[in-house]
Amino acid sequence: MTNSIQLLEESIADKIKNYQKHLNYWEFNDKHVDIWIKQFPEEEREIVLTETDSLLSHNYIKKSKIKEFFEEIWDTKEIMGTNPIMSLNQIQFLNIQIKGHSQKRLVNLLEEYYLKSKGITINRCNHMNVKKYIYLDDCMYTGLTLMKDINNWIDNMSPNCDTQLDVIFLGEYNGNCDYVEGCLIKKCQEKGITVKIYRMYEYNNNLHYALPYDVLWPQYMDDDEYVNAYVQYMEEQKTITGKGGLGFRNPYLGEESDLFTSSYNRVIFEKALLKKGAYICSLPQNRNERMKPMGYSHGISLGFGAFFATCFNISNNCPLAFWWGDLRSSSSETLGKWYPLLPREVN
């Protein structure tokens, strides 16, 4: 092992050492990182580690960053008014997520933080005198979860009419944002509820916006058996469904996304993740149709390509090589054929 590899492994391990500490079942140290990286070809390892370390520096959300997020909410007059303590008497924090634990966890943390730091409790269930509802979550990817939750809330939970809904995310991928906001506004109009969306971090994956993109989206490659097989599968799906798809990105020579250390490294990194993701896609006998090398996604594509993780969990919209697999499974089992860096807690 070279000194640079060891330093990178230690740097990554230091960032993720408290990952899923609430589950208390694994030690995320430099040995853990070393096992993960050795699944990649030796010539790719230093770049994969370098770019992974960079992604974690930007988009791995520790508890301290979550507390900063709560303070930003408190200090934002458009959300909390000029007197947050008084405003809280008319605010309800929603816990309406149909699938997953991220909203409940965040609201619990916010309640605990405001009680300790502000000496005040929040309203989580009482509609009386409520003039504003707050929908809190860690990150918006496609927005489908948000839309399902709000549709169900409007249809079945009798929110107060003529109020306001503030949707607040730690992070937001903007590719579907305009469509989602339009759907929310239309649905909430049934109750006279106005909608505003806030985010702490915004990531560009909107094909109509200027480059660069803040997602992992590989350029073309044709020298890997698993990638070739997956691309062939994509072409077959296009023929069967009569639908188009989103394939490889075009080369880009402009200023690079801050998430990556260089354009050169980014290209190699994305291809490395694609190759391992395509291999992982080949493992299950009955693969979920949303399972794609660069992360779960609807439609015909290489995958969503997000990278956003908290100290509690990582999204399945991230490339499979980061999270797919089971640390406790043997190599003879399907889930034991890949060792994840950030194993995912399934919703």
Short names for language-model regions:
Residues 109-118:
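Short helix-loop-beta junction
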Residues 92, 132-134, 166:
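Structural motif
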Residues 119-130:
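Short acidic low-complexity segments
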Residues 136-145:
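Ser/Thr-glycine-rich phosphate-binding loops at phosphate-binding pockets of nucleotides
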Residues 92, 96-105:
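A glycine-rich, hydrophobic loop/mini-helix early in the fold
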Residues 109, 149-152, 183:
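Alpha-helical scaffold elements adjacent to nucleotide-binding pockets in ATP/GTP-utilizing enzyme cores
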Residues 144-149, 178-181:
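A short secondary-structure junction signal
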Residues 2-90, 100, 155, 161-347:
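PRPP-dependent phosphoribosyltransferase catalytic core
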